[in-house]
Amino acid sequence: MFNGAILVGAGERQGGDPFHAIHPATGEKGSVAFSSAMPDDVAEAAALADAAFDSFSTLAPDARATFLETVADQIVAIGDLLIETAMAESGLPRARLEGERGRTVGQLRLFASYVRLGDWLDATIDSAMPDRAPLPRADLRRVNHSVGPVAVFGASNFPLAFSVAGGDTASAFAAGSPVIVKGHSAHPGTGELVARAIQAAVKACGLHEGVFSYLPGNNRALGGALVADPRVKAVGFTGSRGGGVALMKIAAERAEPIPVYAEMSSINPVVLLPGALADRAAAMGTAFVGSLTMGSGQFCTNPGLVIALDGPDLDAFVAAAAEALSGAAPQVMLTPGIHDAYEKGVAALESAEGVTTIARGTEAEGCNRGKAAFFATDSATFGANPLLAEEVFGSSSVLIRCSSIDEVIATIAGLEGQLTATLQLTDADSADAARLLPVLSRKVGRILTNGWPTGVEVTHAMVHGGPFPSTADGRSTSVGTLAMMRFLRPVCYQDVPDALLPAALQAVSYTHLRAHETPE
């Protein structure tokens, strides 16, 4: 169960200004009063995380992997209470949340298997060359170390997979970093249940209590205090551009600046090339609406921009999309605030000069329902009005009608950084696609063809990141095993006796951990 507690290390406490979850499907206030963490809670959690760092960061890979698996087991053990709580607090349906729970525990287990493999250590040996002329070479050995305690901010749109035990937490644990989670106020009961599962896993594995703390709250000062604490060495964040940039500013102004790995804003352009439009315009129109309206459009990979050459084939796409979208029933949005922001964003597009409304979804019945919207404009209007390139979080998208492939390329070149870009194409479009790919690769973290961007697999190869403002640092990803690298840094050991080296660099570990050795 949950009781609205703050979880600092192995303990729990009440305190701070109380707040309640708002159930978006009904607008009702939840019955449990949740405590808001205070500055003293932040300081104690950071002190415990700092105290836990040495033992946790040097934990043997197998023991760390076992901890990740134990977290997964503890989450599964919560049972249906977790799903029912998340349904009430998020308005998301059961099937979606059951799938998200599977993704969350699967992600933890993937990191466990990767930790055991040891490749992430990147153990590298340049053996001594004492007889080299004119100067001998020292014995040099490099291995990755954890950066230190990590602050993680839970996201609103994935109460399980991008929240307390989501990808940021899983990858930080995998890297050997203690974690302090700032819980999201939209789903505090869900967050506390998962936090208690992690707390139980820490105890079951005999780890230092400071490996994990959970700080609920509904004010920005809490997050700012957490990022400003000198014992925190990195930040994982998924949320709005404004929130992410605010945390980046705090982190940059510290005496010791730290990285903020913030996933923020993306409209994920979809380019419909002429061959694809001639081949399957109507089918693409219907499929596009399915992607746009999935989960009320509350995905960071939602297809918020469509770019295509004007003409009869594009008209066929638009007709099919309009028909599908006109019958789309409004869905519950995650919070009243998100719904209000969506309505304001759609209203701004409806009133923008040079923008026409292609279609709207059916009328909403009940509170906090998002009515889907599809708009159209031309490339000149789009380029002249920055508002049209801003993310509207929800089932809203803008079509840009272009007169040439050069205009398509110029439009893409003018975009900000994005998480994804999609090319709908056939073999007949190869020449155009070849021209587009270099431009797209400068703008996005993931390029896909003949699909839709909303699904993000948790794998070794996945990149869920992109240039600013889609993320704070386009060299990283928040999904997949590569996400560990955000919380690791290389350390080189020169002429250090074997017995004093980290285990991965000792002679007994060479073959097991696949150390790389520079040839003479």
Regions found by a protein language model. Name each.
Residues T511-E520:
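Conserved small/polar residues in nucleotide/adenosyl-binding loops
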Residues E365-G370, I405-L501:
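C-terminal core of ALDH-fold dehydrogenases
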Residues M1-L135:
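N-terminal Rossmann-like NAD(P)+-binding subdomain of aldehyde/semialdehyde dehydrogenases
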Residues F53, S57, A72-G79, I83-A86, ...:
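Structural signal for hydrophobic packing residues in well-ordered secondary-structure cores
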Residues D119-V289, I307-L314:
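Rossmann-like NAD(P) dinucleotide-binding subdomain of oxidoreductase/dehydrogenase enzymes
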Residues F67, A175-T190, V211, I258-P274, ...:
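Short loop-to-beta-strand entry elements in the cores of soluble alpha/beta enzymes
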Residues T286, A308-L419:
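NAD(P)-dependent aldehyde/semialdehyde dehydrogenase
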